[in-house]
Amino acid sequence: MFDLHKFSLRAQEIIEAGGFLYGAGWSPATSSNYSARIDDANIAITVSGKHKGRLQAQDIMVVDLQGRAVASQMKSSAETLLHTVIYDLKPNVGAVLHTHSVTATVLSRALRPNTEIVFEDYELQKAFRGVYTHEGRCVVPIFDNTQDIEALSALSVEYLKEHSDCPGYLIRGHGMYTWGETMAECLRHVEAMEFLLACELEMMRIKS
């Protein structure tokens, strides 16, 4: 089993994150899914189909790192595996956020057939953990959207094993995944990623 107090704390973090992300326009309607680590074996995650701007305690459930529900009959997102593989691969990660902003959706489509986006010489790259200067490249992969979540999760794991400094990834025409050691850090990464994606989209407009 899991610690109920820790679950309650993580659930509250998820609820507050949902209010912020919905308010920013990055998680419209019932899109997106959020999670936070409870312990080495379990995570708290949003129940499927819930409005992320109006989350309540009963909208958060527990799954193990294989994505199986723990002490619950509720159903988590079909994309739960995309969360659990990150926790399994990165023991230091404490939160994972999947958002559906207009910028991430449009830019990932506009860059087709590119399989990555490169941020370079932006001051805000320093918002990502482990980045201390703008003088460098931050590469974010773009994976094609698919209903085959097992295949997509395997693809993400393969990439992240080879690029341990990667701060997140895009799913083309779908949205973005980011993570952090804490929920606060994860939210910072979302904000930074959204800013940088918006800058890249604006640069494309200027150049066209």
UniProtKB/Swiss-Prot annotation:
The keyword Metal-binding applies. One of its GO terms (molecular function) is methylthioribulose 1-phosphate dehydratase activity. One of its GO terms (biological process) is L-methionine salvage from methylthioadenosine. Its EC number is 4.2.1.109. GO terms for cellular component: cytoplasm. Its cofactor is Zn(2+). Pfam families: Aldolase_II. Disulfide bonds: none annotated. Zn(2+) binds at H98, H100. Pathway: Amino-acid biosynthesis; L-methionine biosynthesis via salvage pathway; L-methionine from S-methyl-5-thio-alpha-D-ribose 1-phosphate: step 2/6. SMART domains: Aldolase_II. Binds 1 zinc ion per subunit. Keywords: Amino-acid biosynthesis, Lyase, Metal-binding, Methionine biosynthesis, Zinc. InterPro entries: Aldolase_II/adducin_N, Aldolase_II/adducin_N_sf, MethylthioRu-1-P_deHdtase_MtnB. It catalyses: 5-(methylsulfanyl)-D-ribulose 1-phosphate = 5-methylsulfanyl-2,3-dioxopentyl phosphate + H2O. Belongs to the aldolase class II family. MtnB subfamily. Catalyzes the dehydration of methylthioribulose-1-phosphate (MTRu-1-P) into 2,3-diketo-5-methylthiopentyl-1-phosphate (DK-MTP-1-P). This is Methylthioribulose-1-phosphate dehydratase. It comes from Hahella chejuensis (strain KCTC 2396). The lineage of its organism: Bacteria, Pseudomonadati, Pseudomonadota, Gammaproteobacteria, Oceanospirillales. The gene is mtnB.
